[in-house]
């Protein structure tokens, strides 16, 4: 690897460590010419499947677009960047592990909803309302009732969290 300081091609690895839960290798290097030290990160190049939109068009997987959608749903919610990054990594892992070269945008949306359901119920309902194009309040009620089933929350608890998010009480 070329030295970023002097451009010399001869460098040696001083230290290597696994980082990012073993998905990345951090290497500390030293230039044999100028003796400057620098750090590099090595990750496997994994190809993400192309996304097939509802109208049939195909486009490359765009992690930043996915992140922006999740961040929008989680706006003003008490979820850390680390939790968001972990959710993104799980989504990407599941998409890659299908072995398919293409994935429908609908499947991608369902993967996002699966992660948001675990991260934050308010964000989940926000995303679901846009993703499923809710037309009236009854669709919100039905989704809140589905969300509250099986996890001990009542529909009132989830609805209260949604309402409180718009007031000073619920802002994080």
UniProtKB/Swiss-Prot annotation:
Cofactor: how and how many bound: Binds 1 zinc ion.
At the top level of its lineage, which domain of life is listed?
Bacteria
Positions of the zinc fingers (unnamed)? 3-34
What single Pfam family name could you report for this chain, choosing any that match? Zn_ribbon_NrdR
What cofactors does this protein use?
Answer: Zn(2+)
Family per UniProt?
Belongs to the NrdR family.
Molecular function (GO) terms for this protein are: ATP binding; DNA binding; zinc ion binding
Q: Which HAMAP family match?
A: NrdR
Domain called ATP-cone: residue spans: 49-139
Tell me, in a sentence or two, what this protein's role is: Negatively regulates transcription of bacterial ribonucleotide reductase nrd genes and operons by binding to NrdR-boxes.
The protein, known as: Transcriptional repressor NrdR
Q: Which GO terms of type biological process are on file?
A: negative regulation of DNA-templated transcription
Q: Which NCBIfam families match?
A: transcriptional regulator NrdR
Keyword annotations from UniProtKB, A to Z: ATP-binding, DNA-binding, Metal-binding, Nucleotide-binding, Repressor, Transcription, Transcription regulation, Zinc, Zinc-finger
